[in-house]
Amino acid sequence: MKNFDIAIIGGGPAGYNAAANASSNGLQVVLFEHTALGGVCLNEGCIPTKTLLHSANLLDEIREAKAFGIEVEGAITPHYAAIAARKDKVVQTLTSGVAYKLKGAGVTVIQETARLSGEEGDRILVTAGEETYSVSFVLLATGSSTIIPPIPGLDKVNYWTSREALAAKTLPEDVTIIGGGVIGIEFAGIYSSLGVPVRVIEMAPEILGAMDRETSAMLRKEYGRRGVKFYLETKVTAVSEEGVTIETKDGKSELLPTRQILLSVGRRPETEALGLETLSIATNRSAVVVNAYMQTSHPRVYAAGDITGFSLLAHTAIREGEVAINHIIGGEDDPMRYDAIPSVAYTHPEIAGVGATEEQLRSEGRYYRTLKLPM
């Protein structure tokens, strides 16, 4: 049995930053990650989508160059295989950077799936492969997984999630995106700029439900001018090889023929097979319950990142990991706060927010002022 001060399960933004932080504060750290270091953000989310988006935005700027006094001659042709290859190179470079950071910090990295397996006195046991590790503290940072909704026929078609969309080396002939949140709308922008016909189906009255309603509506209209078709307050009732069957808000049913379906209805905390039951760690709808110091119902087990279900953003995860390590080492009183977390949709144009939206303040009956600056 190997001994460490802290075991961190998960090598995403919460995990790897917390590992380096803990090591710099004198703790002996072991980090477990069964796939690539960097988590969803680096491998299947923030970084690859923004890399593709940069190519798409650059293409838009070239097309608009004449308005800025620049003549571009000849055909303007995106080569998606080359765009995807650049994306892969960026991800590989940054993943290597995470490994280098952890090695430099003296963190022991184990490429295995790990789970909680019990206690011995004041030590927590973590099992990975054939090995068991004895530690004083654990930080759970296993992230989240894509929600697959129970849509009839879904198991009989070759649908994509963001993972498959990012792994593709060719563009789809057309795409129907189920879900109008940040991930879905970012893909809508990428595909429309690259010439792919796009539909977006959203159950809510507006896209980007967590953002300011007026801003979201303005973005939807801009994307509409670019050819993206939106179906709001619309439910997907079935999918097949022929396409997507929808039910509109007035009860009408319609088949939308499509070549590719992209599911983007959200993510859920990844807690399965983690062994939470061995230490009676409390959960709420699969999210690990924590206090303001990221401490779970077990005093020596902490959690950070998407697994807590609060704010599925990389910078939130990093801060949560920081709060957890600070509490473990007995640092200054510095609890986690969620009232001023910035969020961004990397659309074209980008939109961002911080704090409560106007809709939230209105629903809570709180006083607020709105200021608008035409640009």
What are the residue ranges of the model-derived segments?
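FAD-site-proximal beta/loop scaffold in flavoenzymes
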Residues: 155-171, 255-330
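A Rossmann-like FAD-binding core segment of flavoenzymes
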Residues: 73, 108-111, 115-127, 194-292
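Glycine-rich dinucleotide-binding loop and its adjacent helix/turn
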Residues: 46, 142-196, 201, 229-230, ...
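Structured beta-strand/loop patches that form or line metal/cofactor-binding pockets in enzymes
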Residues: 352-375
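Glycine-rich flavin
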Residues: 2-4, 20-27, 32-173, 204-208, ...
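Beta1/beta-strand and adjacent pyrophosphate-binding region of the FAD-binding site
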Residues: 1-14, 171-181
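Short hydrophobic core segments
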Residues: 7-9, 114, 133-143, 178, ...
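N-terminal Rossmann-like FAD-binding beta1-loop-alpha1 element of flavoenzymes
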Residues: 5-30, 185-192
